[in-house]
């Protein structure tokens, strides 16, 4: 089998491993004082100006997000950017519950909120958001690319020390990169909303990650070489564990 066919087959499996469910989010456990973003949330928020829309992310968008994030995880696992090699970093798959909650978040048209975003499988998801505005907006594909690049560039703020112990306190422009390369994260799901404010057009893109980084805990476990603790490596992203690696995303909760 050619490398191209292996990649296409592996990517198809990653995309197909999404999880669709009809969940009553009002019943899910949330930290005290925090409302769930999915509880009784059926419309756009008060900050959405005029003509808000939440376009569906199609397979080409999902594939691009998975390709970019797994490429980044792969090169980080190999020790790029002077980071330590990752012993057990899994390849990411798409999760429909995380994507649905990300879409609901963007419908609030506010980048940061304190709302809970837990799912039945993932109790404390991480989140990254990107907002763009202008007289016109780029295509959805371009917005997604801009967001991923913006988060990736936070590598300049994330140090080897941070990898070993995620820093507490105020975010120093590294949270989004840390979300992308956490070895507790096994799944990702994203959403996009755009709206108008007078002549200005705005868009908010958000991705939810299956686990969040905890201060004082490592972002990922380092190893003498990459993938040394994987039960099986991915057929294309050879420095990452396969998608069926048994990772417990809620251990830090």
Curated annotation (Swiss-Prot):
A motif (Cell attachment site) lies at residues 222-224. Residues 1-22 form the signal peptide. Inhibits platelet aggregation induced by all agonists tested (ADP, arachidonic acid, the thromboxane A2 analog U46619, thrombin, and snake venom snaclecs (TMVA that activates platelet through GPIB, and stejnulxin that specifically acts through GPVI (GP6))). May act by competing with fibrinogen for binding to glycoprotein IIb/IIIa (ITGA2B/ITGB3). Belongs to the CRISP family. Pfam families: CAP. It is found in: Secreted. GO terms for cellular component: extracellular region. InterPro entries: CAP_dom (IPR014044), CAP_sf (IPR035940), P14a_insect (IPR034763). Residues 66-209 form the SCP domain. SUPFAM superfamilies: PR-1-like. This is Tabinhibitin 3. The keyword Chaperone does not apply. Keywords: Cell adhesion impairing toxin, Hemostasis impairing toxin, Platelet aggregation inhibiting toxin, Secreted, Signal, Toxin. Expressed in salivary glands.
